Amino acid sequence: MDIKVPYEVKRNVLLNPGPSTTTDTVKFAQIVPDICPREAEFGGLMKGLREDLVKIVHGDLDKYTSVLFCGSGTINIDVCMNSLLPEGKKILVVNNGAYSTRAVEVCEYYGLPHINLKFPVDQRPDLEVVEKTLKENPDIALVHTTHNETGTGILNPIRELGALAHKYNAVFTVDTTSTYAMRPINVEEDNIDFCMASAQKGLMAFTGLSFIVGRTDVIKASAEYPKRSYYCNLFMQYDFFERTGEMHFTPPVQTIYATIQALNEYWAEGEQAKWARHTRVFNAIHEGLDELGFKDVIKRDEQAGLVVSALYPDDPNWDFSKVHDYCYERGFTIYPGKISNAKTFRLCALGAIDEQDIKDFFKVFKEALEYYGVCIPIRYN
């Protein structure tokens, strides 16, 4: 579909961890003739969308499918935890950050048997400890973790964790919300049974559409598992798609049109070229922070290449809210950290941006520091 852009929308550079900066063509893809989402025409659009979502992670359409849900990324965690656990089994959450903690909270809410295997937020999981836990708990049927813990930017070893899950006959689910369609993923090579994401991050579309890419055979088997949710049930949503070509409940129509356009732009840019662009942005963020003297939370070689978490300066004139507002008024959004034991802020390499945007940002950011009297280079005690 040829998207007409009747005027240029004011462009903001979002350096928060999603939603991300979008193109005008994705924005205007939402302006379409009204349509009932139960029409066959719209069902055909969703079928193509679902197939593309599998192809992005190199899934075989004979083995993998995608299932759409209306909601934020957290709905995917809810769906997988409550839908994919057989009766009498338990979940192992490999947890080194806020987003794996969210999976633990979902388990607690539903009363699902689970093990919260916690590691420090600034360290990767110890694979020997993970294997020991699996060996000692043969009733673990599902292992879950987060690919890129967005609160810190640490990259978790999903391929190795998936291999361990499969060694002990468990299904492996991964929250790939902040890596999908950015950092290349291959579900078969990476030992992933289910991954999940939302349209507003790597795809550079809008909030409200989330999706799970997973093994069709496991979804079908889950039809016999306990039904713990009416809306957030994976098999029910999958089965309704397969029988009718429709979402079980009302879909976010305009967001789906925008996501289809975002997918077109993804394929036009290409997986490797897109990842190279995100890498350029990420490197430019590091260069800017290094020049000012900021310190990272996570070791450079353990970062996912998409989120930089930086420590607050030990400077009485540093005020994140004031610096944020200064940048925001000039078209740049920065974001607070999500680490309970450290004061941090985050700069992210998501969205339709390139390294020139980062250079422009650091001019404004440095102005803000100077305006409020923050010492440069940054001081730490």
Would you name each region that the model predicts?
Residues 1-40:
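N-terminal "arm"/small-domain region of PLP-dependent enzymes with the aminotransferase-like
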Residues 29-79, 83, 98, 102-106:
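Conserved N-terminal alpha-helix of the aminotransferase class I/II PLP-enzyme fold
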Residues 188-200:
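Conserved active-site segment immediately N-terminal to the catalytic lysine
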Residues 295-326:
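Conserved PLP-binding catalytic core of the aspartate aminotransferase-like
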Residues 343-381:
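PLP-dependent enzyme catalytic core of the Aspartate aminotransferase-like
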